[in-house]
């Protein structure tokens, strides 16, 4: 792993941890109620941070190792982009025309081991079709911008690595 690629992955790890902490702060400090799709995006942010940590721990060697690391980090980021795009589509529909966004995560994961530890991360019953804003921009737009920045950064760092 080249120094540039390693620095980029460290940056992505740090930004992902901050974004995850920010999503928890928005829920538990600011009182914003996340919906099922918001929680899915939160889990994609957490997965991006964990993938970056795994890449840093494994220290991939050479161009192919960097490629595998870039792909590994990109998977949850691309998933997050698709979830954010779907939520933006739901929010663009006329009131009452949006389909349900599914069962709450707390219901889906209730019987899983260690659920009590994980439950604060997936708690939320907000409406997916009702937009929340930060600085005048819908939260799924911020989420999509974050995920796009992750993908562009990791692939830029991989392409620049020699």
From Swiss-Prot:
Q: Which cysteines are joined by disulfide bonds?
A: 35-38, 101-128
* Major subcellular location class: membrane
Q: Name one GO cellular component term.
A: plasma membrane
Which molecular-function annotations from GO does this UniProt entry contain? electron transfer activity; protein-disulfide reductase activity
- Pfam families (UniProt xref): DsbB
Q: Does the keyword Mitochondrion apply?
A: no
Give the record's keywords alphabetically.
Answer: Cell inner membrane, Cell membrane, Chaperone, Disulfide bond, Electron transport, Membrane, Oxidoreductase, Redox-active center, Transmembrane, Transmembrane helix, Transport
Signal peptide (residue range): none
Which segments does the topology annotation call Cytoplasmic? 1-8, 61-67, 161-162
Q: Carries keyword Oxidoreductase?
A: yes
Q: Which GO terms describe its biological process?
A: protein folding
Regions crossing the membrane: 9-25, 44-60, 68-85, 142-160
User: Could you tell me the membrane topology recorded for this protein?
Assistant: Multi-pass membrane protein
Location(s) in or outside the cell = Cell inner membrane
Residue intervals on the Periplasmic side = 26-43, 86-141
Q: Please give the family membership noted in the entry.
A: Belongs to the DsbB family.
Q: What is this protein called?
A: Disulfide bond formation protein B
Which species is this record about? Neisseria gonorrhoeae (strain ATCC 700825 / FA 1090)
């Amino acid at each position: 792993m080249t120094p540039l690629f390693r620095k980029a992955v460290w940056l992505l790890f740090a930004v992902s941890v901050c974004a995850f902490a920010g999503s928890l702060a928005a829920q538990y400090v600011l009182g914003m109620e996340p919906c099922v799709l918001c929680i899915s995006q939160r889990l994609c942010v957490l997965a991006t941070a964990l993938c970056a940590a795994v890449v840093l721990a494994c220290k991939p060697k050479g161009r192919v190792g960097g490629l595998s690391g870039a792909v590994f980090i990109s998977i949850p980021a691309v998933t997050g982009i698709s979830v954010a795009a779907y939520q933006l589509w739901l929010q663009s529909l006329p009131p009452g025309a949006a389909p349900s966004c599914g069962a709450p995560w707390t219901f889906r994961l209730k019987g899983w081991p260690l659920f009590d530890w994980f439950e604060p991360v997936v708690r939320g019953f907000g409406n997916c079709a009702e937009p929340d804003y930060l600085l005048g921009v819908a939260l799924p737009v911020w989420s999509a911008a974050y995920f796009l920045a992750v993908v562009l950064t990791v692939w830029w760092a991989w392409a620049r690595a020699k």
